[in-house]
Amino acid sequence: MRADPASAAADIFEANRARGAVRFDLRLQDGVTRRHHLHESGSLRVRFPSPEDDGLSAMFVNTAGGIAGGDRFAIEVAAGEGSRVTLSSAAAEKVYRAPGTPAELAIALRAADSAHISWLPQETILFDRARIHRRMDIDLAETASLLLCEIVVFGRTAMGERMREGEFVDRWRLRRGGKLVFAETVRLDGDIGDKLAQPAIANGATAIGTALIVPGDGALVERIRESLPASRGEAGLSAWNGFAMARFCAQDAASLRADMMAVLGCASAVPLPRLWLN
């Protein structure tokens, strides 16, 4: 009996896809945040650099060297009562062109009472024809706090690449005290470069970013606005439902990163990861 060529090709494709998962939780012991129940699998790893002054630092490493179509990665972090952690990435994450099957990335963050999570990865760069579905689920206790940022760059701007085809789906859900306080799904597909050129979407920007600050209110927004220098790109801030949000867009990752760092510096006393400052 001869094997079905289409089925054989699908099996080969699946066998060559990267898989990776990291799960760990944190506990406050004798006033020090310590990791607990660490699990790693596949090509996703986590490293814990030298202790920072405030809580624990964790850095994710994708040993596959990037994300391609059909890859699947998952990150789960639970911060126990009173613990503090800053989560970052070793480098900008590259998402390569995909023939059809999108990559999948699932992130779940949980923080108990009085715990704090800073989610501060470096930017994600989508190559032309890249396809990725990302899901971010955040569950905070009423007295927990969060500082989160994400930067996405469409196309390799340094070499003049334009994203003429691709798919980007980004689903965020934020719960606080068991209540859903923020839900958003961003979907861009087809000629993404053409869509970003439209004035009502990004007005030609190729890098976009979002920062979430919990808790946050109008007073925090005004304090950030008064302290900020002139932005290199465009930025907007608002607050509702007990959290503050900043949106960014710029012509390149460096400009957006500078604007993001300025906002994060005003919004929180939590130091940025050292890799952000290199």
Swiss-Prot record:
Q: Where is it mostly found?
A: cytoplasm
- Transmembrane region(s): none
Q: Name one Pfam family in it.
A: UreD
Subcellular localization = Cytoplasm
InterPro entries on file = UreD (IPR002669)
The UniProt similarity line reads: Belongs to the UreD family.
Subunit description: UreD, UreF and UreG form a complex that acts as a GTP-hydrolysis-dependent molecular chaperone, activating the urease apoprotein by helping to assemble the nickel containing metallocenter of UreC. The UreE protein probably delivers the nickel.
Q: What is this protein called?
A: Urease accessory protein UreD 1
Cite the source lineage. Answer: Bacteria, Pseudomonadati, Pseudomonadota, Alphaproteobacteria, Hyphomicrobiales
Report which gene this protein is encoded by: ureD1
